[in-house]
A protein has these predicted regions:
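Conserved beta-strand hairpin/beta-sheet module of binuclear metal-dependent hydrolase folds
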Residues: 1-46, 82-84, 147-149, 156, ...
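Active-site neighborhood of divalent metal-dependent phosphoester bond hydrolases
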Residues: 81-85, 91-118
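Active-site neighborhood of phospho(di)ester-bond hydrolases with catalytic His/Asp-centered motifs
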Residues: 33-36, 54-61, 89-90, 205-211, ...
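Metal-dependent catalytic neighborhoods of phosphoester/phosphodiester hydrolases
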Residues: 69-75, 100, 274-282
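Short acidic, glycine/proline-enriched helix-loop-strand junctions
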Residues: 85, 274-297
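General small-molecule cofactor/ligand-binding pocket signal
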Residues: 4, 88, 113-118, 134-136, ...
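Metal-dependent phosphodiesterase/nuclease catalytic metal-binding core
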Residues: 118-266, 277-286
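Active-site metal-binding motif and surrounding structural segment of the metallo-beta-lactamase
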Residues: 38-88, 116-118
């Protein structure tokens, strides 16, 4: 599982920082999570192929989280994209994007599907045989969701030496991967435990964008591999966090501690601060495994 940070700063884009956008690589998927202004430039800068992006998840309709979406959709069209594109986000996102396309007399060359969200309860919004995506209801000034991405590691690892020893044909490999026992030609039943190893522990990533401190999310994100949690302010500006419905680094760390997550990834820093290491310092007072997002960084778990 890899997380590429395209942008992780709050509010306005600058020449040296970008608003929120990330690429999550998980189980052969490449998900784009939020799409602040300048996202497509960052995708090019970091050599991420546009064609690999088939699902885009938008947390809320504040500009620093979705103003890059119409530009990206338009560029896909100009490049002759044919692959379907799925966009998940708050109700209203479809109207906003289609209006801009209509005013420009533009139409996509590919199927564009909008999955608009309205529920204030956690819900599964995407699932296949490898990955499940669930919403994390957040509390901000507008309707906002975070997203929980979970691997499905059902396949067991083949014990090739044992399989070759029993001269088992390849046609049965898939059965072994999914826990099946094998009956040999002489009638012997070989238990799956002899032919395979336990699957890798499934990894998970919780993306929590703009939100006030909210312990209600803890059951949803419990024990995740990585929690990305916004940390717009330091404790010295906690009054601003409350006023604007954002979170401090310490508050994010407390959520991580209570949820018993493995790693905490901080981001969405206010540009008033010149040194983001201050966020780690404050968070470390409560939680040990703290990572700092920054534009262009990649994390692998």
């Amino acid at each position: 599982m890899k997380i590429k940070i395209l942008g992780c700063y709050a509010a306005t884009p600058r020449t040296i920082t970008n608003p929120t956008s990330q690429v999550l690589e998980i189980k052969s998927h490449m998900f784009l999570v939020d799409c602040g202004e300048g996202t497509q430039v960052q995708l090019r800068r970091h050599k991420i192929k546009f064609s690999q992006i088939e699902h885009i998840f938008i947390s809320h309709l504040h500009g620093d989280h979705f103003f890059g979406l119409i530009g990206l959709i338009s560029t896909f069209m100009l490049l002759g994209r044919e692959k379907d594109l799925h966009v998940y986000g708050p109700k209203g996102i479809k109207e906003a994007i289609l209006l801009l396309l209509k005013l420009g007399n533009a139409y996509t060359s590919y199927n564009l599907f909008f999955h608009e969200l309205t529920s204030k309860e956690s819900e599964v919004i995407y699932e296949d045989e490898k990955v499940k995506v669930t919403t994390i209801p957040l509390k901000h000034r507008v309707y906002t969701n975070g997203y929980l991405f979970e691997e499905k590691n059902k396949e067991r690892k083949l014990n090739i030496d044992a399989i070759l020893n029993y001269d088992i044909e390849k046609v049965y490999y898939n059965k072994i991967k999914y826990g099946g026992d094998i009956t040999l030609d002489d009638g012997r039943i070989i238990p799956n435990a002899e032919l395979s190893f336990d699957p890798e522990v499934a990894k998970s990533y919780a993306f929590c964008s703009d939100t006030i401190y909210n312990e209600e999310i803890i059951p949803i994100i419990k024990n995740v591999t990585v929690l990305y949690h916004e940390s717009t302010f330091l404790e010295s500006e906690s009054h601003l966090a409350e006023k604007t419905m954002h979170t401090t680094a310490k508050q994010a760390a407390n959520i991580a501690k209570l949820a018993e997550v493995k790693n905490l990834l901080l981001g969405h820093y206010s540009t008033r601060y010149g040194n983001i290491e201050l966020f780690r310092t404050e968070a470390n007072e409560i939680f040990e495994n703290v990572l700092l997002a920054d534009d262009g960084l990649e994390f692998e778990f």
